């Protein structure tokens, strides 16, 4: 069938591209494979042998090398490597398996769910169908992935097309502690055809390795973009201020009973409130001496050497005297609320008057939006 050609083309043109097989081979001839090794010179008795240069000596092959890989059989392409491009990824040598180690970058995100979602979204972005998947086993098996390349094109006839069809299996394995895992990949089906005719190709181990590494690197590159977006979004969330209210305690109504303790109520989950206090406390002139997130405890010292209190309280007497204190965090009535208590060094609640006096300056710093770095 005659193809439609622009009128500007006055002569027929035929273009030829190198085939995938030819790209593996060195340019030029391979007559060197037929060259025979010449015997050494025979030196007559009584004469000295000439000095031979060893500059161009070819080293002997080791026991694992294949001495048949010469000429057209020698693959000249540089080896591919697994590239840990995404945040929290690195490569561990593990024999012949193709995998990349992935560490969690957000303790609030389930690592296995993140990896599984990233792989599915990557395949969808490339219009690659999923044939089967098993979340419990961490397996994702793709449908046939088809790639076509025009090898010979002529304006007067049909194109000669090289087609590559493959199927892959991804395996997500996360360790029981949930902080790290890995993504492994296997090439499970491979077909090649040229001009509609099936080619009987027996892939070498190196060929399989190249294909799987290339696919894995593409998936990791996609993960890199998504993780960068997630990190930026988290920084934005953490930069936003946290509203804080003071809950005033009531004096004891019965002699001998303890008064209700005043505290601050943060409108944020425990972890976010904890992280914000690491920024706010030093700004208030509270030196963080130690901390224990499991117990929700900050051990702090108050020093009157920053000028903060005098500027904040308009030269009034400091609401908190110099010394050692403890700040205790507890979850509120709901997960998105956190109670903050201020105790002395003996873990006794401070007077309600002191807690309420500090509230104004404390809440201003907690509510302040921060710039993203």
Curated annotation (Swiss-Prot):
| Signal sequence bounds | 1-16
Q: Which residues form a coiled coil?
A: none
**InterPro entries cross-referenced by the UniProt entry:** BamC, BamC_C, NlpB/DapX
Superkingdom is: Bacteria
Any one GO CC term of this protein is:
cell outer membrane
**Cell location:** Cell outer membrane
> What is this entry's stated membrane topology?
Lipid-anchor
Biological process annotations from GO = Gram-negative-bacterium-type cell outer membrane assembly; protein insertion into membrane
Assigned protein family: Belongs to the BamC family.
Complexes and interactors? Part of the Bam complex.
The record describes the protein's role as: Part of the outer membrane protein assembly complex, which is involved in assembly and insertion of beta-barrel proteins into the outer membrane.
Q: Mind telling me what this protein is named?
A: Outer membrane protein assembly factor BamC
What is the protein's species of origin? Answer: Shewanella sediminis (strain HAW-EB3)
């Amino acid at each position: 069938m005659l193809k439609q050609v622009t009128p500007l083309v006055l002569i027929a043109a035929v273009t030829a591209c190198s085939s995938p097989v030819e790209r593996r081979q060195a340019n030029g001839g391979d007559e060197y494979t037929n060259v025979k090794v010449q015997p050494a010179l025979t030196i007559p008795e009584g004469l000295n042998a000439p000095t031979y240069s060893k500059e161009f000596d070819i080293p002997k092959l080791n026991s694992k090398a294949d001495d048949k890989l010469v000429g057209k059989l020698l693959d000249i392409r540089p080896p591919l490597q697994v590239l840990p491009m995404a945040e929290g990824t690195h490569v561990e040598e593990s024999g012949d398996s193709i995998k990349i180690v992935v560490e969690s970058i957000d303790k609030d995100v389930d690592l296995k769910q993140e990896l599984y979602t990233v792989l599915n979204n990557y395949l969808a972005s490339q219009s690659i169908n999923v044939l089967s998947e098993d979340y419990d086993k961490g397996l994702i098996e793709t449908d046939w992935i088809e790639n076509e390349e025009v090898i010979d094109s002529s304006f007067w006839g049909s194109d000669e097309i090289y087609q590559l069809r493959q199927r892959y299996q991804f395996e997500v394995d996360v360790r029981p502690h949930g902080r790290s895992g890995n993504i492994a990949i296997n090439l499970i089906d491979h077909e090649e055809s040229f001009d509609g005719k099936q080619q009987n190709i027996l892939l070498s181990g190196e060929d399989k390795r190249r294909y799987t590494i290339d696919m894995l690197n593409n998936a990791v590159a996609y993960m890199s973009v998504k993780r960068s977006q997630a990190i930026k979004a988290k920084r934005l969330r953490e930069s936003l201020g946290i509203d804080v209210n003071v809950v005033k305690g009531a004096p004891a109504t019965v002699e001998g009973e303890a008064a209700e303790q005043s505290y601050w109520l943060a409108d944020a989950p425990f972890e976010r409130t904890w992280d914000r206090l690491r920024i706010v406390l030093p700004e208030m002139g509270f030196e963080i001496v130690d901390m224990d997130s499991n117990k929700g405890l900050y051990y702090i010292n108050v020093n009157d050497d920053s000028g903060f209190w005098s500027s904040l309280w308009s030269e009034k007497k400091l609401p908190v005297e110099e010394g050692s204190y403890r700040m205790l965090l507890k979850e509120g009535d709901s997960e998105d609320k956190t109670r903050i208590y201020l105790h002395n060094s003996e873990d006794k609640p401070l007077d309600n008057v002191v807690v309420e006096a500090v509230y104004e300056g404390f809440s201003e710093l907690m509510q302040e939006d921060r710039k993203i770095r």
